[in-house]
């Protein structure tokens, strides 16, 4: 009828207590009722360019299984980010061609080939770092090939995870660098442990999503 959802097994409420009805898309929940637990490994060079994506279930031990293919083969180094529903892979290195600006995405809960999301706004970017939350994916730093002086970049760029489209400019790191590995909370990203042209850098940069 038109009475709306019914909760079975609840007969009375004591005082001001009650139950919290689940809300939001069921895409945010695993089919078995557990927590989010899938990892996806993509791309590589062996020595040719690889488009393979494998997946693992983090809660259990075992070999990876085939998930699907990237839009084209390339080496991807620490340039993946994810929300609860999507995984994005941005940039990478193509043997014989150079760096890639492509962004691919997949739906984590289902296997299948990657879809085109858009492009990074720096066409020759690799060895960059990334941070992400449920809303934004952010890439920062990178090595420019061919390695013109200084061969690294300080650019920060972002995408909105739930949409598709090219990356937009977010801002700049405090200096040019590559390998700016990132960690994040739901509200803040931190980049540290970077390498400049010479020598390595101990600088730590923070940003708010």
Regions found by a protein language model. Name each.
Residues 1-209:
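Polar, enzyme-active/binding microenvironments
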